[in-house]
From Swiss-Prot:
CDD domains: ASKHA_NBD_ANMK. Catalyzes the specific phosphorylation of 1,6-anhydro-N-acetylmuramic acid (anhMurNAc) with the simultaneous cleavage of the 1,6-anhydro ring, generating MurNAc-6-P. Is required for the utilization of anhMurNAc either imported from the medium or derived from its own cell wall murein, and thus plays a role in cell wall recycling. GO terms for biological process: 1,6-anhydro-N-acetyl-beta-muramic acid catabolic process; amino sugar metabolic process; peptidoglycan turnover. It is an enzyme of class 2 (transferase). ATP binds at G15, T16, S17, L18, D19, G20, V21, D22. It catalyses: 1,6-anhydro-N-acetyl-beta-muramate + ATP + H2O = N-acetyl-D-muramate 6-phosphate + ADP + H(+). Keywords: ATP-binding, Carbohydrate metabolism, Kinase, Nucleotide-binding, Transferase. This is Anhydro-N-acetylmuramic acid kinase. Belongs to the anhydro-N-acetylmuramic acid kinase family. It comes from the Bacteria. Pathway: Amino-sugar metabolism; 1,6-anhydro-N-acetylmuramate degradation; Cell wall biogenesis; peptidoglycan recycling.
Amino acid sequence: MINMKPQYYLGMMSGTSLDGVDIVLVDFSQDPQLILSDFFPMPEDLREKLTTLIQVGETTLQNLGELDHKLALLYSDCVNAFLQKNTFLPNQIQAIGCHGQTVWHSPNSQFPFTMQLGDMNLLAAKTGISVIGDFRRKDMAWGGQGAPLVPAFHEAVFSNSNFATAVLNIGGISNVSILFPNQAVIGFDTGPGNTLLDQWIEKHQGLRYDENGEWAAKGNVNKVLLDELLNEPFFSLPAPKSTGRELFNLVWLNHKIAKIREKLTALSVEMSFRPEDVQATLVELTVTSIVNALNQLQTDLPKRLLVCGGGAKNSLIMRGLHDNLLDWQVSTTTEQGFDIDYVEAAAFAWLAYCRINNLPANLPSVTGAKSAVSLGAIFPKD
């Protein structure tokens, strides 16, 4: 057996939940292998400023520049702590694949753009490791949505000729990769994952997230509210499609609740919107939007669903998927060698590997781009 020299890449992801930074070490000397992983919480002041920026959608250039710098410092601290903890040296790492922090994603406007903060030059300088970043804009330059990018990685590590596989990532936003044998890969956002659940419980309970769906379990689904939420035009758009917190946020949710109240007031009807009932309804929104998307798929092969992301730890969401997808074998990516919490971070290590090796890494069938191209810009360490 040939002993191949390890090809170590770091992958970093801070997602729409804004809870912190996921970091992984992946070896690409043979089949991609997840070696190490860790999570670093985001400082509260930085989290609050980013949340405000994303929800309001307006800021000063000064604030934008400072957040760009602060995120790079956070990322570099995470990398250096991760390497020190695991006794790795910077020169053992080929490159860092860093997604950055999305603050706006507008692929369907007259002038499409996406914006991720985190100065990659500073990250390279502070770590002594070359960085690959700015992945999404290359795809958009070629007419794509710039998202989702992870399905290409899912295809590389999870495709199986014996199964019609769907890989479901329930992060802040839920996205799914459809890996059916002999078919072009399809990947798209299904709608909110944890983002509304996290924002709602933080507002009403002061908690970052609803652990295991325990608060939602105390509530009852409000069918009227659920129907109103599902009326959002995004859900009926054809794939490829992508979305984010710029749509699914508390402003959107409160507008929907106010709309129902207005209708009911005109009919002299009262309806309670207990916070825990709204939380239960938001769980049902996540589940229903996923189920509706998967039920449209046709295949004669056995179907399996591999779930990853924070939502895979919410027993209410997982029970909803099991109960409503009876012809699917539902499990998690952990059983396939990739921890549910670190699949996205591993994907950006893979994207960095592809960029260094000049391999195309987007899927036109997923993003709508005119061509398969290499993604990301290289920020050398020196």
